[in-house]
């Protein structure tokens, strides 16, 4: 017997028709009596709107050997299969599983079965409905995520554009990801044309490469910051992690119980080893500076001072670039960066002068095309004492056989230790910047110890050499103070025009120092005692306060 189904919109009965008969009988599915020895065929070609259900096979009692199989040789429409198809009408589909099961697990009991179809038990209904509800809730959740659009989108931590993924440890867009990749692969030396405070956003991210790279490091981008969680974003666990991460960024820091998940941790730049730090500092070394003009003979005081100030101004430009390349220097506060350079610029120039002159006894190599002997330097008034101090310090460097790794570490320590006692503010930003400065200074000190240990000396010899190298810094500071006094005196006498950058650095060094000028008793008044005097710069109106700060007494001496 075959069943032909004619699905109508409002009909809940199936039409049962014999193969060899033209009568159509309407009978309910559950209440109609059926023959137990014949298969049921419901080959209705039904397809629901928007739902495509697979064919569900059902088997009659004939397949389980507890009834005699009927003779079906005269029924060509059934063919050789006993596995008919069942399709449900469209108005009866409510998104749940079929409410009818076949007695497939009970043939061994030998019970007399009147019909191959039975209703589900209440427990089966509960289990089926719970599975269906769970499936619907999961589909609804995925639908909300897909239809929510930008609800779960992330923004680039650098330029605040839409992020394309988790790159180098942070959420970033394709542009910032590619820019950071190029920067770390090619070692580009970017220089900010302004004050390293350029605004980096979606529209102005290409205006300053130096500030853009600085912001990449500030937000946590690192070469080793690979994404640990690379699962599908549609996974429920991944959605919960990213949703919690976005809430943490908007609502501030919170204490989480249990282990932290990868994307929730703010990735920190990996700490450099002592060897890597020295390599980075050596790569930051400025190139050789040439005077690019012939010295007139015989040498005069004005001629020598003009050449020396010209070289100093050129070296100051490269010194700023060198300081920016030192790992961790740009992480300091901007005021600290400026103060460090203003307080140590002459010391940095002098240790570089000693390093260039170490192989030329009795001479000072200011540049490859400018070298002065003691006799030539004596023509500058007050310069001979400074010249002798520089020659003596250079001889000490030669005796210690200073290595290049040790030299770059000492030079970096001069920069980082220059204004250690001048900062008096106690704000949170100042304290944080100071702690970064101390950590950076400790890292450079460890690198110096590593460079000394690499020479193969014993522990006692290493400690002794470290002490001797550190004592060089005090000699350089002493010579620098002498040189600052001499340069300031030349400026007051208008002996030589000073360039803008050199003049600014000279005035800033005097201003940041704690040494105050001592006025003569005839000029002292109550108002003058309350207000400290400031050195007069050329080109400004007002009385000229001519004084030369002493390097040892802590007070200025009148001229």
From Swiss-Prot:
Broad class of where this protein is predominantly found: nucleus
Chain intervals with Polar residues compositional bias: 243-254, 538-551
GO MF entries: hormone binding; nuclear estrogen receptor activity; sequence-specific DNA binding; steroid binding; zinc ion binding
Pfam family of the protein (one): Hormone_recep
Region (Disordered): 128-148, 243-269, 514-559
Gene3D superfamilies the UniProt entry points to: Erythroid Transcription Factor GATA-1, subunit A (3.30.50.10), Retinoid X Receptor (1.10.565.10)
Annotated region of DNA binding: 156-221
Annotated stretches, region: Modulating: 1-155
Residue ranges constituting the NR LBD domain according to the UniProt record: 273-509
UniProt zinc finger (NR C4-type) residues: 156-176, 192-216
UniProt keyword list: DNA-binding, Lipid-binding, Metal-binding, Nucleus, Receptor, Steroid-binding, Transcription, Transcription regulation, Zinc, Zinc-finger
Keyword Metal-binding: yes
Location in the cell: Nucleus
GO cellular component terms, A-Z: nucleus
UniProt-listed GO biological process terms: cellular response to estradiol stimulus; estrogen receptor signaling pathway
Domain writeup: Composed of three domains: a modulating N-terminal domain, a DNA-binding domain and a C-terminal ligand-binding domain.
Family membership: Belongs to the nuclear hormone receptor family. NR3 subfamily.
PANTHER family the UniProt entry points to: KNIRPS-RELATED PROTEIN-RELATED
Function: Binds estrogens with an affinity similar to that of ER-alpha, and activates expression of reporter genes containing estrogen response elements (ERE) in an estrogen-dependent manner.
Assembly information from the UniProt record: Binds DNA as a homodimer. Can form a heterodimer with ER-alpha.
Protein name: Estrogen receptor beta
């Amino acid at each position: 017997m075959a069943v032909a189904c004619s699905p109508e919109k409002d009909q809940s009965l199936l039409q049962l028709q014999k193969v060899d008969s033209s009568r159509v009988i309407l009978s309910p599915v559950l209440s109609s009596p059926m023959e137990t020895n014949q298969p049921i065929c419901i080959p209705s070609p039904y397809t629901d709107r928007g739902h495509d259900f697979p064919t569900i096979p059902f088997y009659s009692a004939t397949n389980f050997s507890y009834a005699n199989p009927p003779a079906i040789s005269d029924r060509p429409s059934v063919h050789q299969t006993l596995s008919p198809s069942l399709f449900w009408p469209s108005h009866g589909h409510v998104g749940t599983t079929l409410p009818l099961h076949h007695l497939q697990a009970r043939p061994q009991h030998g019970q007399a079965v009147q019909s191959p179809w039975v209703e589900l038990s209440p427990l089966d209904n509960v289990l089926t409905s719970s599975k269906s509800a769970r499936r619907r809730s999961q589909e609804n959740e995925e639908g909300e995520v897909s239809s929510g659009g930008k609800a779960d989108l992330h923004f680039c931590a650098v330029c605040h554009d839409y992020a394309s993924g988790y790159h180098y440890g942070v959420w970033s867009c394709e542009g910032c990801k590619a820019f950071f990749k190029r920067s770390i692969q090619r070692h580009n030396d970017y220089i900010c044309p302004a004050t390293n405070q350029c605004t980096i956003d979606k529209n102005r991210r290409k205006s300053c490469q130096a500030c853009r790279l600085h912001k990449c490091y500030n937000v946590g981008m690192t070469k080793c910051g690979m994404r640990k969680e690379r699962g599908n974003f549609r996974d429920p666990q991944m959605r919960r992690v990213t949703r919690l991460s976005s809430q943490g960024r908007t609502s501030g820091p919170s204490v989480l119980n249990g282990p932290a998940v990868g994307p929730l941790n703010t990735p920190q730049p990996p700490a450099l080893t002592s060897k890597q730090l020295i390599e980075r500092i050596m790569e930051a070394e400025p190139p050789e500076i040439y005077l690019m003009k012939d010295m007139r003979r015989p040498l005069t005081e004005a001629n020598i001072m003009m050449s020396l100030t010209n070289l100093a101004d050129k070296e100051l430009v490269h010194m700023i670039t060198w300081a920016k390349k030192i790992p961790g220097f740009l992480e300091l506060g901007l005021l600290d960066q400026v103060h460090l350079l203003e307080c140590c610029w002459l010391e940095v120039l002098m240790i570089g002068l000693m390093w260039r002159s170490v192989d030329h006894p009795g001479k000072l190599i200011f540049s490859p095309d400018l070298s002065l002997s003691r006799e030539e330097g004596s023509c500058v008034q007050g310069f001979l004492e400074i010249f002798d101090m520089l020659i003596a310090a250079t001889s000490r460097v030669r005796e210690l056989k200073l290595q290049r790794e040790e030299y770059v570490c000492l030079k970096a320590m001069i920069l980082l230790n220059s204004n250690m006692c001048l900062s008096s503010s106690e704000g949170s930003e100042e304290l944080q910047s100071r702690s970064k400065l101390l950590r950076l200074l400790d890292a450079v000190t460890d690198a110096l110890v590593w460079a000394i240990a690499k020479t193969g000396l014993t522990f006692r010899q290493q400690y002794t050499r470290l002490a001797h190298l550190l004592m060089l810094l005090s000699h350089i500071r002493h010579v620098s103070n002498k040189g600052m006094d001499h340069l300031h005196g030349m400026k007051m006498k208008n002996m030589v025009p000073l360039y803008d950058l050199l003049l600014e650095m000279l005035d800033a060094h005097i201003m940041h120092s704690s040494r105050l000028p001592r006025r003569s008793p005839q000029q002292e008044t109550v108002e003058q005692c309350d207000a400290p005097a400031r050195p007069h710069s050329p080109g400004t109106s007002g009385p000229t306060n001519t004084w030369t700060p002493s390097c040892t007494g802590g007070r200025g001496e009148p001229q």
